[in-house]
Regions:
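GST-like domain detector, emphasizing the conserved glutathione-binding G-site
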Residues: 1-145, 196, 216, 269
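GST-like fold's C-terminal all-alpha helical module
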Residues: 113-269
Length: 269
């Protein structure tokens, strides 16, 4: 019987989206638990040393924190057993691997500003959803008054973090322009391939899905924006959260990646 892992986090977490997508695509059994779970506060946080998510717990009590480390845990475990993951995250060829790493970095760092901007600067549309969502994850069984205080504290921290990351009145026009350009370019690419590098997701896709799912396709304001102006990207987000192969948009079955000498022009723009 396969091991069932415990994954602690929250749906709104950018890096939780990266890990969840990977586990689903690999058909790795797991139970998703919220950061407000008493066990997380009593056992996980002291062991890790701080309040941070996601954290994966194995059946023997081993804890792995950080999305990249969790993915590497499974990839390295398979390699040590002379096995291969169902859908290896790291391409075997040089150019494809370099492109995958580049987009992993872009997803985790380059997309951070639009993710934070479109979450925290549109309260009229987002705030009610965010408050309910954060409270459900961080304080699921407490009284409403205390839960709202928890949200207010978390919200203030995240808004300050957004500014620290470079989301300011001066930078917002450029952030919005660059994000719109990304949606346009990625939409064009997704008309010819279901994933970044071809027929299956790689570490580049897991980097992209982190901001695209948790913030930009899930929070009300940017979700509507994506559905209206970049439906191909929205369907990509849905594919990345499905454990099975999804043959929408005229794609045929197959999990091959582009060869190094046949990278599409849409990856070079």
């Amino acid at each position: 019987m396969p091991e069932v892992y415990q994954l602690y986090g929250m749906s709104a977490s950018l890096y939780m989206g990266k890990v969840r997508s990977y586990l689903r695509k690999q058909h790795i059994p797991f139970v998703e638990r919220v950061g407000g779970d008493p066990y997380f506060a009593e056992k996980i946080v002291p062991a890790v040393g701080r309040m941070i998510m996601p954290v994966l717990e194995t059946s023997n009590g081993t804890l792995i924190q950080d999305g990249a480390d969790i993915i590497d845990f499974f990839e390295q475990q398979a390699a040590a057993n002379n096995e291969s993951m169902r859908l290896p995250a790291y391409p075997s060829t040089g150019v494809a691997r370099a492109v995958a790493y580049l987009f992993e970095l872009f997803g985790g760092e380059g997309m951070l500003r639009p993710a934070m901007h479109y979450r925290w600067n549109f309260d009229e549309t987002n705030l009610s959803f965010l408050k309910n969502d954060f409270m459900a994850s961080l304080f699921p069984s407490g009284d409403v008054e205390t839960a709202e205080k928890v949200f207010d504290f978390a919200s203030k921290r995240m808004r300050a973090a957004a500014v620290a990351f470079g989301v300011t009145l001066e930078s917002i026009p450029l952030i919005e322009q660059s994000y719109a350009e990304f949606l346009d370019l990625f939409s064009t690419h997704l008309k010819s391939a279901p994933y970044l590098l071809g027929g299956r997701p790689t570490i580049g896709d897991y980097g992209l899905i982190a901001p695209l799912f948790a913030h930009l396709a899930r929070d009300p304001y940017p979700s509507l924006q994506m559905r209206e102006y970049a439906p191909e990207v929205f369907r990509y987000v849905e594919r990345m959260n499905a454990p099975e192969q999804v043959l929408t948009d005229g794609f045929s079955a197959g999990e091959n990646l582009f060869s190094d000498d046949a990278m599409p022009a849409t990856l070079k723009n």
